[in-house]
Swiss-Prot record:
Ligand binding (ATP): S225, G226, G227, V228, D229, S230, S231
Protein source organism: Neisseria meningitidis serogroup C / serotype 2a (strain ATCC 700532 / DSM 15464 / FAM18)
Protein name stated in the entry: GMP synthase [glutamine-hydrolyzing]
GO cellular component: cytosol
Lineage: Bacteria, Pseudomonadati, Pseudomonadota, Betaproteobacteria, Neisseriales
EC identifiers of the protein: 6.3.5.2
Catalytic activity: XMP + L-glutamine + ATP + H2O = GMP + L-glutamate + AMP + diphosphate + 2 H(+)
Gene: guaA
Quaternary assembly: Homodimer.
Length: 521
C-alpha cells in the first residue's frame, strides 16, 4: 500500500519532533529531515506537502537555508515561526528583528482563510497560541495576504491561497496552542489531501512483509532487555520470521524484581520465541566491585553486556542479522550528531552498537516509529499493556540507582523496595479512577549506601535508607516532582520498612529537573 507522506524540514527547533508526532496522530506518515535535504531527494520522497519548522537562527545566516526549489514543486507548504520567515524572505518579503521578543501565550485575530476555516473553538476569528520568536515578517511577499495578527506582530499569519503557501509565527505543535492540532490537521488532511492510512494494522502488514523480504531465510539475533523497544521489536520480527529469530536475554543482576522470569514467560513460553537466558550476575558484580563513579559504572555495564552478547552471538554461527530496537528519535538524534546541526543531542542505550568484529547486518524494524507508536504496536502484537506502558528503565538498570559501589546485597534490597513502590502506585487511584502509576511519568526507588538509627519493637536498628522518586513530565527535558498523596507515601514507607529486612528509613525526593536530574546517577 502506498502511503501519502508529509515532509518536515528541520531548522533546529527544540520542538520539531512534536510536529512529526502531531502529523502521525492524524494517521498520516511523515518524516523529519535536515533543512538542507537536497532537492532531488525531496522530489524522490514525493511528499503531499512540506512543513518548514521553527529554529533559533536568523534568515540572514547563510548556513541555515533550504533549497528554494521547494517553492516550485507545486505542493502546499506550511512555514512555522522561522519557517514562515524563511518563506517570506525568499519569496520577496522582508524580515526584521522585532522590537521585543514575543514569548508565551498570545491571541491571534484571524480572518476567514483556507488554513483557519472551521478550526476556531469558542471565540470566532481568534486563536489561542504559543509564541516564541524575536524576528518577524515586516513586509509580505507578492501574492500573500495577512490572515492573522497580534498587537505586537501585525503579520502573525499569511497565505498565498493560489499556491497554497502558508506562514504562521506561532507553534501549532505545542499543547499550549489550543487549536494547534486542528490547524495541522487542516493543512495535512484538507489542504494537502493526504489520506489518513497510517495505522498500526497497516504498519504491521507492511513491516512484516519488509522484514521477510529483507531477511529472506537468514537467521536473526536480538538482544532482549525486557524494555519496551527490544520487546516490541522481538514480537514484530517473530511475527514475520518465526524461528529464524533467536533472542539473547542477558540477566546482569541489575533488573527489576522477577523481570527475568517475566521476560522468559512472555517470550519463550507464551509467544514461542527462542530465547537464550544468560545468567551473568556474578560476572557483572565482579567487574563492578569497588567502583563508585557513576560514569565508570555505566561504561563497565555497557562493555560487559557487549562482551556477554558477543560470546553468545559467536555460538550462533548461522546468524546473519543483528536486530535492534532503534526508534525514530534515535535516528533523528544520530543524524543531528553527524551533521552537528542539532541543538540538543542525547546519547541513547542500544546494544552498544555493532562491535567492530561483528560481521552482521543491521535490522531495525522500529526505526520509523515514535515511542507512543511503539507502545501502540506492542499492544497490537499482543504484548500485555502492563509491559508495553511501563515507565522508562535505564540501560545500566539498578546499577545507577544504587549510589556508589554496586553489591548484590544492595541490589536485592532495592529490588524489593522498588517493587513495593510500584505496586502501591498501580493500586492507588486519584478521584477520576486513574492509577498514580499512570499519572506519573517515571517512578522508582534509589538505594542510599548509608545507615541510620531506627527503632523496631523494643530494639534499636541500624539499617539502610531508600529514597523514592516520582516525576511528571511531557518530554523528560524538564520534570516536576509528583505530588503523591501522603497516605500513599505512608503506605509505601510502612511496607518497605516492615517487609524489606535491612531498610529502616524511607525518604521522598522533592527535587525538580532542573536543578536535579531525574535519575540520581
Amino acid at each position: 500500500m502506498t502511503q501519502d507522506k508529509i515532509l518536515i524540514l528541520d531548522f533546529g527547533s527544540q520542538v520539531t519532533q512534536l510536529i512529526a508526532r502531531r502529523v502521525r496522530e492524524a494517521h498520516v506518515y511523515c518524516e523529519l529531515h535536515s533543512f538542507d535535504m537536497p532537492l532531488d531527494e525531496i522530489k524522490a520522497f514525493n511528499p503531499k506537502g512540506i512543513i518548514l519548522s521553527g529554529g533559533p537562527n536568523s534568515v540572514y545566516e547563510s548556513d541555515y537555508q533550504a533549497d528554494t526549489g521547494i517553492f516550485d514543486l507545486g505542493i502546499p507548504i506550511l512555514g512555522i515561526c522561522y519557517g514562515m520567515q524563511f518563506m517570506a524572505h525568499h519569496l520577496g518579503g522582508e524580515v526584521q528583528p522585532g522590537n521585543q521578543r514575543e514569548f508565551g501565550y498570545a491571541q491571534v485575530k484571524t480572518i476567514d482563510s483556507e488554513l483557519t476555516r472551521g478550526i476556531q473553538d469558542d471565540t470566532p476569528n481568534t486563536l489561542d497560541v504559543w509564541m516564541s520568536h524575536g524576528d518577524k515578517v515586516s513586509k509580505l511577499p507578492t501574492g500573500f495576504t495577512v490572515i492573522g495578527d497580534t498587537p505586537s506582530c501585525p503579520i502573525a499569519m499569511m497565505e498565498n491561497a493560489e499556491k497554497q503557501f502558508y506562514g504562521i509565527q506561532f507553534h501549532p505543535e505545542v499543547t499550549h496552542t489550543k487549536q494547534g492540532r486542528a490547524l495541522l490537521n487542516r493543512f495535512v488532511l484538507d489542504i494537502c489531501g493526504a489520506q489518513p492510512s497510517w495505522t498500526m494494522p497497516n504498519y504491521i502488514e507492511e513491516a512484516v512483509a519488509k522484514i521477510r523480504e529483507q531477511v529472506g531465510s537468514d537467521e536473526v539475533i536480538l538482544g532482549l532487555s525486557g524494555g519496551v523497544d527490544s520487546s516490541v521489536a522481538a514480537a514484530l520480527i517473530h511475527r514475520a520470521i518465526g524461528d529464524q529469530l533467536t533472542c539473547v536475554f542477558v540477566d546482569h543482576g541489575l533488573l527489576r524484581l522477577n523481570e527475568g522470569k517475566m521476560v522468559m514467560d512472555m517470550f519463550a513460553r507464551n509467544l514461542g520465541v527462542k530465547v537464550i537466558h544468560v545468567d551473568a550476575e556474578g560476572q557483572f558484580m565482579e567487574k563492578l566491585a569497588g567502583v563508585t563513579d557513576p560514569e565508570k559504572k555505566r561504561k563497565i555495564i555497557g562493555a560487559e553486556f557487549i562482551e556477554v552478547f558477543d560470546a553468545e552471538e559467536k555460538k550462533l554461527t548461522n546468524a546473519k542479522w543483528l536486530a535492534q530496537g532503534t526508534i525514530y528519535p534515535d535516528v533523528i538524534e544520530s543524524a543531528g550528531a553527524k551533521t552537528k546541526k542539532a541543538h540538543a543531542i542525547k546519547s541513547h542505550h542500544n546494544v552498544g552498537g555493532l562491535p567492530e568484529n561483528m560481521k552482521l547486518k543491521l535490522l531495525e524494524p522500529l526505526r520509523d516509529l515514535f515511542k507512543d507508536e511503539v507502545r501502540e504496536l506492542g499492544v497490537a502484537l499482543g504484548l500485555p499493556r502492563e509491559m508495553v506502558y511501563r515507565h522508562p528503565f535505564p540501560g545500566p538498570g539498578l546499577g545507577v540507582r544504587i549510589l556508589g559501589e554496586v553489591k548484590k546485597e544492595y541490589a536485592d534490597l532495592l529490588r524489593q523496595a522498588d517493587d513495593i513502590f510500584i505496586q502501591e502506585l498501580r493500586n492507588t487511584t486519584d478521584e477520576n479512577g486513574t492509577s498514580w502509576y499512570d499519572l506519573t511519568s517515571q517512578a522508582f526507588a534509589v538505594f542510599l549506601p548509608v545507615k541510620s538509627v531506627g527503632v523496631m519493637g523494643d530494639g534499636r536498628t541500624y539499617d539502610y535508607v531508600v529514597a523514592l522518586r516520582a516525576v511528571i513530565t511531557s518530554d523528560f527535558m524538564t520534570a516536576h516532582w509528583a505530588e503523591l498523596p501522603y497516605s500513599l507515601l505512608g503506605r509505601v514507607s510502612n511496607r518497605i520498612i516492615n517487609e524489606v529486612k535491612g531498610i529502616n528509613r524511607v525518604v521522598y525526593d522533592v527535587s525538580g529537573k532542573p536543578p536535579a536530574t531525574i535519575e540520581w546517577e
